[in-house]
Curated annotation (Swiss-Prot):
It comes from the Bacteria. Keywords: Cell cycle, Cell division, Chromosome partition, Cytoplasm, DNA integration, DNA recombination, DNA-binding. It comes from Yersinia pestis. This is Tyrosine recombinase XerD. Forms a cyclic heterotetrameric complex composed of two molecules of XerC and two molecules of XerD, in which XerC interacts with XerD via its C-terminal region, XerD interacts with XerC via its C-terminal region and so on. GO terms for molecular function: DNA binding; tyrosine-based site-specific recombinase activity. One of its GO terms (cellular component) is cytoplasm. FtsK may regulate the catalytic switch between XerC and XerD in the heterotetrameric complex during the two steps of the recombination process. Residues 3-88 form the Core-binding (CB) domain. Pfam families: Phage_int_SAM_1 (PF02899), Phage_integrase (PF00589). Transmembrane segments: none annotated. Residues 109-293 form the Tyr recombinase domain. It is found in: Cytoplasm.
Length: 299
């Protein structure tokens, strides 16, 4: 049997997709990790149904010593835990050998953020007299006003947006729905774009996508990322400060800087775990520390 056809792994991934609705990229990464585990176990005269905690710890240690990054090691451990929990739950094993495995220590990475002045410069970069750039202006305004993920933004339909109520309906990770306020500025630019930009882009086509590409199709995340980089150059923003989610990060950090409650920011971002949102408090605290050092006479 070919290694990539391991039936236990495929059964597990099918169940995981049905239960958790994980992204295809995550499932593909899990598949690679788990096939590597099966290969290692086979080489050591074992398999998924007989592997011991010591086997799994040795496999994980070899991966880390071989240059696996902490993030990759954490993903590998997550895949292993979920697999063996599944095997135990399905009564294919009498135990869960991952129960006592130790997690690799992850360094805390602060999100790249922009100052409010940099965000203003970025948002003012598109030439709104050009329909394509008017669309981009509306997209940037919506992104900063709502903190949406880029994938959520490019997937918006006309029916997802209520300009009268000033809210957007978002289907996030795990098909979870949330309503996010737009704010007056974003509403204004969507209205402007709907009247003067979108008709030119769709060119008479029947299309429900709110922000189509210039070929009357749904825009890809990669295309919009290139647009962000283009406007960042015009705004004089260092590319080192950029990421596809740079305005999502700015949205969260600036809200916290202005006193927003952490749980409200969590709800707006669509985070299921508060700890995911808490990293933005470190960005805000770091900014305060820098300002203190710059301006306090005894800093």
């Amino acid at each position: 049997m070919k290694q990539q056809d391991n039936p236990l792994i495929e059964q597990f991934l099918d169940a995981l997709w049905l239960e958790r609705n994980l992204a295809e990229n995550t499932l593909a990464s899990y598949r690679l990790d788990l096939h590597a585990l099966v290969g290692w176990l086979t080489h050591h005269n074992s398999d998924l149904l007989r592997a011991s905690p010591q086997d799994l710890q040795s496999f994980l240690a070899e991966r880390i010593e071989g240059g696996y990054k902490a993030t990759s090691s954490a993903r590998l451990l997550s895949a292993m835990r979920r697999l063996f929990q599944y095997l135990y739950r399905e009564k294919l094993r009498e135990d869960d050998p991952t129960a006592l495995l130790s997690s690799p220590k992850l360094p805390q990475r602060l999100p790249k953020d922009l100052s409010e002045a940099q965000v203003d410069a970025l948002l003012n970069s598109p030439n709104v007299d050009i329909p394509l750039e008017l669309r981009d202006k509306a997209m940037l305004e919506v992104l900063y006003a709502t903190g949406l993920r880029v994938s959520e933004l490019v997937g918006l339909t006309i029916s997802d947006v209520s300009l009268r109520q000033g809210v957007v309906r978002v289907i996030g990770k795990g098909n979870k729905e949330r309503l996010v306020p737009l704010g007056e500025e974003a509403v204004y630019w969507i209205e402007n774009y709907m009247e003067h930009g979108r008709p030119w882009l769709v060119n008479g086509a029947s299309l429900d996508v709110l922000f189509p590409s210039n070929r009357s199709q749904q825009m890809t995340r990669q295309t919009f990322w290139h647009r962000i980089k283009h406007y960042a150059i015009l705004a004089g923003i260092d590319s080192e400060r950029l990421s596809p989610h740079v305005l999502r990060h700015a949205f969260a950090t600036h809200l916290l800087n202005h006193g927003a409650d952490l749980r409200v920011v969590q709800m707006l971002l669509g985070h299921s775990d508060l700890s995911t949102t808490q990293i933005y408090t470190h960005v805000a605290t770091e900014r305060l520390r820098q300002l203190h050092q710059q301006h306090h006479p005894r800093a």
